[in-house]
Amino acid sequence: MAESTAFHDLATFLALPRVSSLALSPDGTRLVTAVQELSADGTRFVGALWEVDPAGQRPARRLTRSGRGESAPRFLPDGTLLFLSSRPVADPGEGEEDKQEAALWSLPAGGGEASQLLARAGGIGEYTTATGSARIAFGASLLPGATDAEHDERLREARRKAKVSAILHESVPVRYWDQDLGPAVPHMFTVADAAEGGAAAVDCGARRAAIAQGVALSPDGSLVAYATAVGSLPDEIRSVVVVANAETGKPLRMLESPEAEFDAPAFTPDGRDLVCSRSRRVTWDAPGDVTLWLASATDEQDAGRDLLPDFDQWPGAPVVSPVPDDDGAPVVYFTADENGHGPVFRLSAGSGELVALTASGTYSDVVVSPDGGTVYALRSAVDSPPTPVRLDAAAAGQQPVALPCPGQDTVLPGGLTEVHTTAEDGTALRAWLVLPDGAGPENPAPLLLWVHGGPQNSWNAWSWRWSPWVAAAAGYAVLMPDPALSTGYGQHMHERGWTHWGGTPYDDVMALTDAALLRDDLDGERTAMMGGSYGGYMANWIATRTDRFKAIVTHASLWNMYSFAQVTDFPAYWMRRQGDPLVTTERYERESPHLRAARITTPMLVIHGDKDYRVPIGEGLALWNDLARFEVPAKFLYFPDEGHWILKPNNVRLWYTTVLNFLAHHVLGEEWQRPDLV
């Protein structure tokens, strides 16, 4: 009998600790991470800060505890630990209403009680610190007409008392993912010393923070760089990086281009230059590209230069070492998807020398020690949840040293292998294959095909939302292909799928499925397909093309490309790729699954959240109505209070339960069981 694991029981699975983010103290002796766990009543995930021993000798130690949780740890130069929390300053029962906005809190370096440093009526958002200054930069919003924080608070109180919720828009966009934008406008502020409070905060400018992320302070705190968005017409809106004087708020320069997006700024150790992410904008026939860009922080005449002209993958946000190389050039670390993994890379900005520090796994939240000799990061993989690790800052192909932290003793209900094949055009294709315990020639496992979202994405990291191990615990094998449009396989992989999202990617998915089913430990007669977002689009596309699967689960999926392009939260991107649906109809006619609804015969489970603004609920409703119209066996799992992702613990439990019950009915031939509470 197979060993029971946390994945065999959804309550136990949801209670597993979830590690995210890292912060390193200025002296390099303290490493802090955030760990989410279930609340006592099981209805929320609550974060807490834990200190991890950088040497890996001592067990992790919990630093914070509150009902609201803590996140986003960062250090000040004196060792004070900062974090965000919506915990109340005092018991709300003693007076003030508990409004639950996130504020900036601090823990003294020598220990003691946490105290609130900065609070705003609309909450504190993205923030950062300087390595050699007490200055802090933080994001907060102001209502139109507000002249300062106090005025803003009065205006908010007036809206609350009047019970006004209306938002008057005069520009696009109006929504982003699951957020309604406005009426308050995000701004970037700096404060010379957070201990003095926010009254003296300097306003460095309004920003469209929802669609442009990243803020950095120069080491001495004199400059602030932050991403924002410019442009008024939908097709003109793009992300740029603004550099401002952190003491006065005066803008000094802007990194921008009509053909590119800039974000994720990081200063070099001397504060003179910036390293940013630069993304070429997509067009009708080109899928865009990503690189890292080096430019002067203050000289507007310096257009900058590409740091990775010959690198064929897409780098993530740059992290600049506090110590330059022997020639005085900046040393930049970044991660990038590569062949089903996500290594940490080290780049010398002077020589262009590039080294992959890791051989396997996918990394995030990279931080560098003060002496530049050690790198810390979170490592995950399809078969390993995120955990903090230590790396030598220069050695290639390392196996990282795991540092003791909650959530490391996870036993899996199966194993992981790979499937390889070759596309018709000669492109090498690969996929991960999760095999449940007990699968073999005498007991072949039913197969689930999972197509990832994006579509410019990769199955290369742990997922709590789409865990193949929950499916494996139920006895399924899970095939996780990286077809055309996936990241980590060079620019050619994007280009070969860009002009027909239902063409080459579909062919690749089918080719990898066929290759997997050559194995004698998989049952080709019991198969199903699942996907979310673009993966949901592919689910719908597959449903109109073949009846080979016993069931299809489509989550947050695109159905009618004509209507979708007009109502998604960021239509400019889609129109640049697809054209105006009222003028250039070719791609819509070729790619929209709804035009082929009458072909569908496979039973389908449709899942959608009402607060999904990326793929609005109308897509799920239209699909559901078409399935009913053509009498396709189907069910519709609707979440009125969720967005593109299902995040609330008991909704997550219901998501998995409904999916598994639907599959058991149609793939395994079991009687349908309606989940409890729906």
Regions found by a protein language model. Name each.
Residues 46-48, 95-101, 141-191, 238-239, ...:
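Predominantly five- to eight-bladed beta-propeller fold
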Residues 23-30, 72-80, 127-135, 215-223, ...:
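Blade-terminus and WD-like Trp-Asp/Gly-His loop motifs, strongest in beta-propeller folds
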Residues 31-35, 81-85, 137-139, 223-227, ...:
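Residue position within the beta-strands of beta-propeller blades
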Residues 481-678:
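Active-site-proximal cap/loop segments of hydrolase catalytic domains
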Residues 404-519, 523-525, 532, 564-571:
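Cap/lid segment of the alpha/beta-hydrolase catalytic domain
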Residues 41-46, 90-101, 179-184, 233-239, ...:
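Short, solvent-exposed loop/turn segments at conserved positions within beta-propeller repeat blades
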Residues 1-18, 52-71, 95-100, 105-123, ...:
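Multi-bladed beta-propeller domains
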Residues 11-47, 183-186, 215:
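Beta-strand-rich domains and repeat architectures in extracellular enzymes and scaffolds
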